[in-house]
Amino acid sequence: IKGIRWWIIVLIMLITIINYLDRGTLNYMWVTNIEYVISDGQTTSGNYALKDNDNYILVKSNGDRLTVHESKLISKEKNGVDIVINKEGIAYDLGLISPDLSEEEAAKAAKDMLGTITIFFMIAYGISQLVSGKLYDKIGTRKGFSISVLLWGAADALTSLSCGLFSLTGFRMMLGLGEAGPWPGTTKSNAEWFPQKERALAQGLFGAAASLGSIIAPIII
């Protein structure tokens, strides 16, 4: 097929963008500041908060409710509207951060846990890059890419079953094992499909896709 090598590099660029979206999800959703408009009792669109003595009932746009003591919330005015800000995210959803911690203690705990997860992810990622290079040489790029994508796809699915720091770290390590393969795999693929005078361009497109994934991750997530 004429020009098939360019279709191949486009597909590799696509999975590379997805790769970096996957990688960034935990970082951007680990702890998030969610704004709630203080309501006078009327249901409003979007997130809103109802005062209940010393607590606020936080109502998400999807109807989910959460009761939080007012001391745990940040109150401010935005565009002439009173709002409260609640810290949420994966770390809180998994119960990894105690609600009794102060804001400074909670921030430190969240940072330390994310750092631990990232370290183990990168250990798995580095080991996989060494092993994947040999694997792709042995079984070829088609099978190699298939194994890598299946592995990190399974890691993504299993991450939804995480129930604590240990399981989440394990699934992130699995993600690292799967995500690392395309780097040596792309180098091999470019050598197989592109003439020598076009290989630098192909490799540059691959690198640009990695940067693009990092750029759009915070926008999409």
Question: What kind of feature is each model-predicted range?
Answer:
Residues A208-I220:
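A gly/Pro-rich, aromatic-decorated transmembrane alpha-helix motif that marks the paired
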Residues I127-C163:
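Conserved MFS/SLC helix-loop-helix module at the cytosolic interface between two early adjacent transmembrane helices
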Residues G140, L161-F166, G178, P195:
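Helix-breaking motifs and short loop linkers at transmembrane-helix boundaries and internal kinks
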Residues I12-T16, M122, D156, G164-L168, ...:
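Helical-face signature of the major facilitator-like transporter fold
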Residues N27-G126:
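Extracellular/periplasmic helix-loop-helix junction of adjacent transmembrane segments
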Residues F171-A208:
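Cytoplasmic helix-loop-helix junction between adjacent transmembrane helices
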Residues G24, M122-L130, A180, S214-I215:
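Residue-level signature of mid-helix packing/kink "hotspots" within the transmembrane helices
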